[in-house]
Amino acid sequence: MRWPSVATLAGLRMGVRCDRSGTVAVDFQTAGGGRMNGLAYGVAKADGGLFPSVMSNRYFLQDASFLVGLSADDQRLLERLYGALASPVWQLYLGRKGYVPSVPPYLSDGLVHRDLVPALAGYPWADRADATVRVVLEETDPLGAEPRMDQPVDYERRRFGRRYVRIEMLSGPRTLLGGGARVSEPDTP
């Protein structure tokens, strides 16, 4: 089965509701520079030698909660994407390192037949959601929108193009139900 092109996927309209912003955390990492079974090992150099330990800081977002919606005229495409998230062939990760999502990246009741904004506004909010949440929507009209140079054009060559986004604030419920229950319906914009 052939998957959609980057251009087809770029044609989808995306919206993100940020229920919890989370916090930025740092993970200090090292690679190589040690010994295993008495033999030195590490990151190989072109001449066959070894680099000393490579140290780096990796930044990631912890304890955040987002609801992402996609909209398209092609319902079959949305169903294929939804099915791919529900039954992935490879392990899913967030970012360039294997940061695995703590919950499945799809909702069992997430494939809905509504416009994008009402669907994002009307879906129950996550536990501990902020009282007011940010909603980021892709726009085709640059008027009143902010440019972003992160629209994938070519994954192989890591080329990106411009897209436009609009940010709105959405007020929601101020009291949450305990015990992992979902919150009440939010106010719509």
Give the label of every model feature segment.
Residues 5-10:
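Short, glycine-/polar-rich solvent-exposed loops and beta-turns at beta-strand/coil boundaries
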Residues 13, 17-189:
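Internal, well-folded beta-alpha domain core
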